[in-house]
Amino acid sequence: VLISEVLVRNKLQVSEAEVNNISIRFLDRKSIVPQPAQTAVDLIVRGLIGSFAYSHRLNLSLERTPGTLVHGNQDGNSNLTIGRWSGTAGLIFQRYNSPLTASGNTHTETLLAKSATLELTDEQGLPVLSFAEVMQKCVNTHRSYVVGSVDSPLGPLR
């Protein structure tokens, strides 16, 4: 695997890898993107470490819900809002170590590249206002995801 020089253009880094004359490009970008009213931050990082491609993402946002949706007895002009912080964090690793083959023969030894993927995601929503603790089961959420997969080469195939 040949790793080329890292090019820097407008704070965007591009890494290139060449495997059996197949060029693969990986983007490495670090960006913080504030959302409207500066209530959310999004950070994404991608890159290449040897034969590992990685990506991780962090998102943090403040969500506000009008209090009239929860407390039906409030008048329509009330400025009561219920806010909660929620965020996601994810980490993805992928590994490629078998060559892709297209020999043109009636059979080949490898059909697809061997790869492995592991993805971890965790999301937490927190109540912001003190009276929301009474309704914590309604506004507080926590979700976790773990996904893994491993592919193996198939062959010989005809």
Curated annotation (Swiss-Prot):
Superkingdom field: Eukaryota
Subcellular localization, as worded in the UniProt entry: Plastid, Chloroplast outer membrane
One GO CC term, this protein: chloroplast outer membrane
Keyword vocabulary terms for this entry: Chloroplast, Membrane, Plastid, Plastid outer membrane
Broad class of the protein's primary localization: plastid
Family: Belongs to the OEP80 (TC 1.B.33.2) family.
Protein's recorded name: Outer envelope protein 80, chloroplastic
Organism: Pisum sativum (Garden pea)
